[in-house]
Amino acid sequence: MPGNSRRRGAVRKSGTKKGAGVGSGGQRRRGLEGRGPTPPAHLRPHHPAAKRARAQPRRPVKRADETETVLGRNPVLECLRAGVPATALYVALGTEADERLTECVARAADSGIAIVELLRADLDRMTANHLHQGIALQVPPYNYAHPDDLLAAALDQPPALLVALDNLSDPRNLGAIVRSVAAFGGHGVLIPQRRSASVTAVAWRTSAGAAARIPVARATNLTRTLKGWADRGVRVIGLDAGGGTALDDVDGTDSLVVVVGSEGKGLSRLVRQNCDEVVSIPMAAQAESLNASVAAGVVLAAIARQRRRPREPREQTQNRMI
């Protein structure tokens, strides 16, 4: 009987799939065994899709310290009102004027910013065809201070009060913290060079001009910089909801650096280990943790209140209670 494997001389073929291993269509199943799934077309070197992908020009990665271009009438006007340093204001020819555009041009002229009129097509190319509403503001890279210079300037006005940001990613939080540092008598802000928000036009606007007065320094290694500051007599206090020291028990009259963690993960392990103490803000039981910039403002306000009325030595306080 055809197909009967029990007949004399019959040989059972290996494999579970039906059909010939070699046949019309060039399947050759045995040759493909163990090679895994077929990769996507753009990853196969000789496929037309891969050739097209290689032919496309690669977009350069924007560095954080490059010149920034702010687009749109409202963002440009907010930057000019906040005193964000700028080098040029670009206005497309034929753009319909309104109150915002008129104010932008007037403020740029008053601030000595170059006003450049250009064709809309040229502005499209300059902004990579992003929506610009006929106006763009060129903002130069921020001039960061050196961590050693920042500390030296703070120690010249004792007691020093500095804020370090441990991988904070939102530039609006950075700007808000710079504003709080200026409001409560701080001397500067320290940020990591990598994986951190930088002083962009967004941070400038949020700081409401405080970024022009409060220096910001960048550290190649935040943990190492904090260790160096501690060796020079500055007490490092971390800010975390699970901290073992309540804010009410912190002596804010010493030279301090307040370390604020990132929005999601808080303080990193190495930074936390190098803090002299980790401080928490007492809150109502039903309240959740505070935003990073809000928490920094609360701590800075508490420290400023103590410095306006320095705490009495503990021995005097105990004697008065007796």
Curated annotation (Swiss-Prot):
Compositional bias per record (Basic residues), positions renumbered to this chain: 1-16, 43-61
Residues annotated as binding S-adenosyl-L-methionine: G261, I281, L290
Disulfide-bonded cysteines: none
SUPFAM superfamilies documented for this protein: alpha/beta knot, L30e-like
Entry-linked InterPro entries: Alpha/beta_knot_MTases, Ribosomal_eL30-like_sf, rRNA_MeTrfase_TrmH, SpoU_MeTrfase, SpoU_subst-bd, tRNA_m1G_MTases_N
Keyword S-adenosyl-L-methionine: yes
Pfam families in the cross-refs: SpoU_methylase, SpoU_sub_bind
GO (cellular component) term, any one: cytosol
Renumbered residue ranges of the record's region Disordered: 1-69
Domain of life the protein comes from: Bacteria
Protein name in UniProt: Uncharacterized tRNA/rRNA methyltransferase BCG_3644c
